[in-house]
Amino acid sequence: LDKTSSDNPKHIEVLLPYDAANESGSTADATFAQGVFKGIWSVLGPYFKDGKAVSPSGTLTSSSTESDWVSVAFDAAKSERVKSTLAGRLGMDKDTSRHTRIDGIISCNDYVAGYASEELNDLGYTGSAADINPSITISGIVDNITGKKDLKKQSVPDPAQAPESDDGDSDTEDTSDSLDEQNSQWPIITGYGAYVSSIPNIVNGKQWMTALENRKT
């Protein structure tokens, strides 16, 4: 993001799972969801403010604050809700012929990340994290795990300005197809929890990363 231009910003969505009512029907404690978004926004907020990051859905803007966590929160109790929420954010469905550009999806756990990946696949997005950084190799991953080297994922830098189509050009249709091909590229998808079920998606590049922490300390 530091190398991103406001003329060609990164398109990012935040998927924050939060059920406003618990199993007993009473209001759920929002402390955890608020804390998660506060951490996310402490990093992303400055980029949104400078126009280097935008939300395709408009749920987050340059004037958003950490108090706007509810705008990206949704009930993720059912898998179909995760998928429909993402499709709605992108303004797409399975019959949409053109793709909405999405560079990153901040999924706050591996459960959400998994179904976000499934929905992107259903919508026709293609590729994987390996396309974002082709320098990542199996041997490099093994060396990283064994402590022989540090492996850093770095994306190929975007041009300073987003490509524009010229309606007066005879090649407008070709340009449009080329732009849609770019827009349909697989985004970075983050997760959390190191769920066993998420490992295949990380191995095949559909999920960028996961994380875990020792809560006993």
Task: Please state what every model-predicted region is.
Residues 1-217:
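A residue-level marker of the well-folded mature domains of exported/periplasmic proteins
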